Structures are given as structure tokens and as C-alpha cells.
Amino acid sequence: MIVDDIQVGNGRTGTFFSFERAGIKPDMVVLSKSISGFGMPMAILLIRPDLDIFRPAEHNGTFRGNQLSFVGATAGINYYVEHSMDKVVQRKAKMISDFLESEIIPLNKNLSYRGIGFIWGIDFNAIDSTLALKVVHKAFDNGLIMEVAGRKDGVLKIMPPLTIQDDILNEGLNVMKESIVDVLN
């Protein structure tokens, strides 16, 4: 089994690997994007030891690593461990889910949401899938960068940085709500 943890690994779901809560033991895990710690280019393929056929230095090449990315990854992983980011993400995830339940869902009975950790989506498909992109544009006008995902790009994606401060998270959620209200009206 190969797990794609490119977007949802590195603490995004509240555990370092997204599959931990399911008790899965993958053969391979693919990581990139946030593994470098601050956006430097980096990708890693983790392989179960009994499947790894390469000896040290056997699998290499001219473009085998970006040293700055390695330093960033080390610092990012150390920060994650030292600051118990799994607990931080889980606490702030509750802030997000509580906000969605109390402030967003009451705006329209056809809205729904789903997510875990620091990756959530508000589904506009039951109303009109084009509304999600309109919210993205309105949010941008209001100073918040968001994106869409899902079928017909009808899901508004919520993916704050793991290190976001509580007050900034609340500010972003309120800007998102204001943008949704503007689009729905």
C-alpha cells in the first residue's frame, strides 16, 4: 500500500502522518511540500525496510538533494516535536469545527462541511458549485487567500498554516464568514 501524504502529512491532520489514526502500516509513504519546513523544494519516499532494494549511495544522481531543504525539514520536524504540534493542531481543529458548526452552517441549510485537523472543506454543491469560487474571490478582496477543491470546484478549502496564532485563525474564519455571507446574499 502506498500512502500519498504530500498535502495531508507532516501534521496537517493532527498526527504527523495522516494514516496514523487508521492504524495503517503502509509499504511506502510519499511526502513533499511542507516536509521542507518552509516551502523549499523537497520530496521524500519512505519505504518499508524489507522492500528497500537500494544500498546506501546506490540510488543517487546529480539532483539528489537541496541542502537548504534538508536544513528546513530538520528544523520543521524539530519544531513539530518540541512544540507538541499534534496537540496544537487538534485543539485548533476544534476551533475550526466549532466555528463551522455555529457560524457557517446556519447561513444556509444546504451547506455542509467535513475535515480533520487543519484541512477542512465547506461544500457548496447542494446550493450552486460556482459559489465556492465566488467566495474565494470575495475572500481575496477581503485580504484572505483561499482555494477551491472537490467536484466541480464546489468545495471551499480551509487549510491554515500549522503555526497560526489563535487570534489570526479567528480573524481568518471571520473574514471567510463575511465573504460567504456577501456571496450568499
Predicted features and spans:
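Conserved N-terminal phosphate-binding loop of PLP-dependent enzymes in the Aspartate aminotransferase
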Residues: 1-185
